Amino acid sequence: MATLTEIATLEEKYIELCKMHGILPNTAILSAFFEAEVKKSRNQRCIMNLYVDRVKYDDYLPLLELCNEINTSEVQGIDLFVRSACSLEDHYALPLIRSVNQKLRVVHLHDSFGKNFWQDVFFQGLSCKVLNVRSMHIHKLNIVGEFTQLHTLILDKNRIVGFGEDCFSCMPKLTYLSMCDTLVSDLWTSAAALLKLPSLKELRFQIWISCSDSSPLNSESSPSSSTKDDINTFIESDPPVEADMWDVAEQMDPSLPVEETLHSMDFSYKIPEQDDLDSHVSVSAGLNGEVLMREKVRRGKMPYQPKDVSPVDTFTRQFGNVGLKYISSKASPICSEKHYRMYMINSLPKLQVLDNLAIRKSDRDKAIETYSANFEDLPYKRKKESVVRVLENREKRSSKGKSQNSYKRSLCAAKMGSPASPLLHSLPFLSSRIQQEDDNSRLCPRQFEYHPLDPSLMVFGTLDGEVVVLNHESGKIFRYIPSNGSQSTILGLCWLKIYPSMVIAGSANGSLKLYDIQKASSTVTTSSHSTSGSVTFDEFDQLTSVHANSTDQLFLASGYSKDVALYDIGRGTRLQVFANMHQEHINVVKFSNHSPFLFATSSFDKDVKLWDLRQEPSRPCYTASSTKGNVMVCFSPDDRYLLASAVDNEVRQLLTVDGRLHLNFEIVPRVSSMNYTRSYYMNGNDYIISGSCDENVIRVCCAQTGRRLRDVTLEGNGSDFSMMYVQSLRGDPFRDFNMSVLAAYARSSSLSEIVKVNLLASRDSTAEESHGLRSYPSSSMGG
């Protein structure tokens, strides 16, 4: 057996290397040797602390050579720290870290390295047991390298939005994971990624801090400056995120001791002398801190609630004679999702502690019940099957009496059960310039509609007033109609159903035209538009919405007014203006899909109204009210329901016959008066899709039960990753579980995109696999 190099010999070697390179030894490295010698003399584990942020370029070569010697020395472990700005660039720091990889124990890296560094680390892996990373400039986490010894992973205070398809796939021993104060918000992709961790026991996206409200000095005491410092030690001044506290409050069992309920696991560590990383890696600091704070509260030395934490993020529960107040701190956005805690407990059966609250059997029972009542595991209540099994059953016709529609639903469920992240891709024509006389011109969509009969076509209108018919399967432009000269944004589009080559386009300046796309140009051009093949109607000032009836005889227009105009398509004339139909302007007007006389209007006056052209226009059939202004309304494909979307995620389904509430989808609001929500149907009447302009999430819910099937997070490119939001969306009328989303960016320099979403395919699907199951509806389907 080879003799291990002693620490004193290593130190001498380092000094000699420095002399060879003509530099003075680094004092931080000499201190590390001294500390290691002290530990050795006390018969403690010989651990060296290496502070890379104190290493300068002159120190680099001697240290790199020394690290190669450490692997064969009596040093038992290396704890590597970068706590402040590091002078070493990525391509210097990475070889240094890898040179001691065999003995790495703890790696703590903070705000120092770029994307290339992290991509290399996460792809190649490390042999450390603890990895603590902060201020990392990566939005999509994709740790696929071998981290076979990793026990604790701390990712707090990073701008992580989501996870790659194979993230966490090589971490067999990971037991503790913390992702507080990140941007993670998606329950579905997060749970799918975390399921790849077979040993995960403790997880946190937030910290529940307990303090007592039983102090006699609740309202009268004024804390000293030292007390304020103590508070800030445990609760940072960041504004808290509204957490799913009611789930937590309901599951707190007052019969249990406090210690069994509040598991004070803190991942901010202080490495112990013994190698007990397999029990708890340095949790003493946080545990003692919370106990100390609780004792101060009970003795009246602290106010019962810190001033920088909103009471919305607290709940109180009695334990005997003591009332404990729990405060959410450092919460990631995922914590504000409704039933977040119950969803995670149900999805991660091996988890023992979530957000430092212990999970008991009663919690799991409640989680199963909550999940069943509020979520769909697979569409159409199907059980998980393989695609091969479903296809075999269809070929054998083993299930008597089953229709083709039943097999199709089973196949959809089987396909949706496979990918964690659905296939998303932007229509390709937006990724490059359209060659025009003006070389800087690009088509920027503002509204779009699927063709009623041709599954490959959609029309979109641009910010500059152009109308473009696109083959969205090939990405090629089929027809192009330039702006009529005013360059006013197209806000209203509607295909005719009986005459499917005709499309109505309405502009923000009030212009209304009917185009025959067969007579339009097949190439993009800036030449003046020929009026042949188009019909011009009387203008409707500040137009926002147009829609034709089921017989293609009439269409309606609404805008920033209280009025609605009725037009005769065949004659090209305006028949009537219905005045003062609402108290505020009318956002959307929609005809019924089957009746040529019924139509609905939605307004910011909080009302949705149903009208009948055969009756007096001053009196609606009924009025249904929301608590906020209505952004839009649409009929279900069979006209049984009205889907009303109000500001900030208030989505309700009404019975068309009398306006009674059928379902409230109970989507969590963002508490924003500018969060305009839009919702449409998908898969006929089966599901609804909903998105809002302040969020990058599309929610998919069952239209019959209101249960959430899943959320889809939009992903921008590069720095825009988390800056996309939903401007409009439509379910694909020909493909089950497919949709398109008009997604805009917060930055004015970035153009909008039309993003196609396929819930049945994963993001690494081939082109052949990405096509959805087609279900050709009747031509009467509108909206």
Swiss-Prot record:
Task: Name its GO BP terms in alphabetical order.
Answer: cellular response to UV-B; response to UV-B
Is Repeat there in the keyword field?
Answer: yes
Task: Alphabetically list the UniProt keywords.
Answer: Nucleus, Repeat, WD repeat
Source domain of life: Eukaryota
Where is this protein found?
Nucleus
PANTHER family tied to this protein: BNAC09G30780D PROTEIN, PROTEIN DWD HYPERSENSITIVE TO UV-B 1
Q: What is this protein called?
A: Protein DWD HYPERSENSITIVE TO UV-B 1
What lineage does the source organism belong to? Answer: Eukaryota, Viridiplantae, Streptophyta, Embryophyta, Tracheophyta
